[in-house]
Amino acid sequence: MQIKVDTKEKFTTITPVEPKIYVNMAAELTGICDGILLKETKNVILNLQPVSDIEDGAAELIAKLQQKFYDANASFVICEIKPAVEEVLEKLELLELLNVTPTESEAWDIVQMEEIERELLDDGDVEFNTNE
């Protein structure tokens, strides 16, 4: 599977180069993402802009991959999906389960908001000032 990888401070963007994602390609993507989960910066944005078709099994693997990231306290956001890919996800009843944004910029925002949320939830000593 040919992909472009762009690592930023808070996340890594993965963009497949091929126009169709097959099951074996999604399995390879899972292996790549498993490696990212071991790094300090473990949030992923999957940019599907070049992808015009996806096999059912590949879509299911990507949904499982997203859950693996959230179970590991990391973000996994999919962006720029084309209508044909969206139809496959909808048919498999996965679209509502996935964290999908129209643009990569919005995906960045989601990752940053989830990072802030995790920081707040991890800080068990949250104090509220009730002085009036």
Language-model regions, residue ranges each:
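Short, solvent-exposed coil/turn elements at secondary-structure transition points
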Residues: 11, 19, 82, 104-106
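STAS-typified acidic loop motif
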Residues: 2-33
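Amphipathic alpha-helical interaction surfaces in cytosolic regulatory modules
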Residues: 26-98
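Non-catalytic signal-transmission and effector/linker regions of two-component phosphorelay proteins
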Residues: 1-5, 121-132
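Charged, low-complexity, helix/coiled-coil-prone segments
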Residues: 1-13, 45-58, 107
